[in-house]
Amino acid sequence: LPILDSFEKYPMKSQLDNKEILGLSGNILTEYQDAKHLSDTDVQASGLIKQFIEQYPKEHTMIQKFFNIFCNRELSRLPASRVFKNGLRFKQRQGTFLVAQQNRVLLRLTTPNASMLFFKGRWWETLVAHKVRSWSQKRPNSPEVWQSVLFQTEGNNPRTKNEVDVLLNNQQKLIFIECKSGQVTQNDIYKIDAVRETYGGDI
């Protein structure tokens, strides 16, 4: 920014929000959740899921395989209940999700998002977003934190282009956080590389 009477130049200082930065880069937002609105119920449920996975890894794997293979990772295809070998079973009904074995409760969640958090792995994304939000709230101007950010492809194709798990606007630099709670596959590496190719930056 030049000062006319002295012809001195000073750097301009401005703050752009996430929508402005993404808009300038030509990306179309389809959907996102502001981490400011994360519910305490979902954060607590995510913590319980984490404890369950750490304490009962075999049981979690069995239930998750059923969802991945027989439900094709679609929540709409999940049955109201399912019984596995060794008396393991899960049941979901009206915002309550239950995992039990031999009449012993291993996990009980009470939130409308229970199935999404458990089966889609959103529990880890939620915990990460919660931590980043807590950090942001302690910073000047509270940098924006978004979760589950979806972008649209170019043209008329409504297909989702990319999903960013957690997006942080830190001093005009967008930080993309990929959340993985399990094994990292080659597809995950490709996804991160695609984000770099689309939005720039380093890995």
Language-model features, listed with the residues they occupy:
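Intrinsically disordered, low-complexity Ser/Thr/Pro/Gly-rich regulatory segments
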Residues: 2-203
